[in-house]
Design a protein with these regions (language model features):
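Short, low-hydrophobicity acidic/polar segments
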Residues: 1-150, 196-209, 229, 239, ...
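Contiguous ligand/interfacial binding patches
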Residues: 153-218, 222-246
């Protein structure tokens, strides 16, 4: 029997049809524990659909997770986005860049690593999987062209970086079995900068600049936005209230006034 999955995504997180997930599945089979259930004997590649319910199904022949009579003690681990180079689920790469080069014609990469696991005694398809974002959140900054006709850069950072113990940007790994993210010691940054080259002329109305950040607690002294305009002058604004929580999977919007 090919195993399918019902995918519950984080609130507000949308995916395109046929987005790819990785599924690692084991069971006890013929008294052998932790037997890999994938047809490819590795990590199965599953497709996402939302035709009726959010649902994961095998993406191609040979990519299914297969259950057999007598199997038991099932363990399922799933992650998004699928990456063929990921073979060790105790070290899934995570990368949140500290510097972003923004291009008006490109769709910003707002992908957050999603992960889920489930342990069941029997299979009643589809197997429910509840996904959570891994140590990442999204921030959207809305900028009016009446305030900033041309933008060269924007920077988000704590007002008092010296007392901020978190990291807005970092690279590292995520262990899906332990549910733990680990950053590389030298990779952390307390700020994120978006560059617009020699300057980008904002169209009429509001322009939304969105990017991914690491989850963090609101820093002592606050969080600030610094925008450098085309003429070299800067605007600095304090963002959000001290009670704001930037939890994994959350999306925040700040509108420059």
């Amino acid at each position: 029997m090919d195993v399918s999955f019902q995918a519950t995504l984080p609130k507000g997180y949308a995916l395109e049809e046929n987005s790819l997930f990785g599924i690692y599945a084991t069971c006890t089979r013929a008294e052998k524990v932790n037997t890999n259930m994938a047809e490819n004997s590795g990590i199965a590649k599953y497709s996402f659909t939302e035709e009726a319910i959010p649902y994961l199904y095998k993406s191609a022949e040979g990519e299914a997770v297969v259950g057999k009579k007598g199997d038991h003690n099932y363990k399922f681990y799933a992650f998004y986005p699928y990456d063929a180079s990921v073979t060790d689920l105790s070290a899934i790469p995570v990368n949140i860049p500290a510097t972003i080069d923004w291009k008006a014609d490109d769709t910003p990469d707002l992908t957050m690593l999603l992960a889920a696991q489930a342990t069941v005694t029997s299979i009643i398809a589809p197997v429910p999987m509840t996904f959570e974002a891994v140590a990442q959140c999204r921030l959207t900054i809305r900028i009016p062209n009446t305030t900033v006709p041309v933008i060269k850069s924007l920077k988000v950072a704590p007002v008092k970086e010296s007392v901020f113990k978190g990291q807005l940007a970092w690279s590292g790994t995520y262990d899906i079995f332990e549910g733990k993210a680990t950053s590389n010691e030298s990779s952390g940054s307390k700020s994120i900068t978006v560059n617009f080259g020699s300057g980008y002329t904002l169209p009429e109305g509001y322009t939304e600049i969105s990017f991914v950040m690491g989850e963090f607690k609101y820093p002592s002294g606050g969080l600030q936005l610094q925008i450098t305009k085309g003429d070299g002058t800067t605007i600095t604004k304090k963002m959000f209230e001290a009670s704001e929580v930037f939890a994994a999977g959350s999306s925040k919007v700040y509108t420059l006034s």
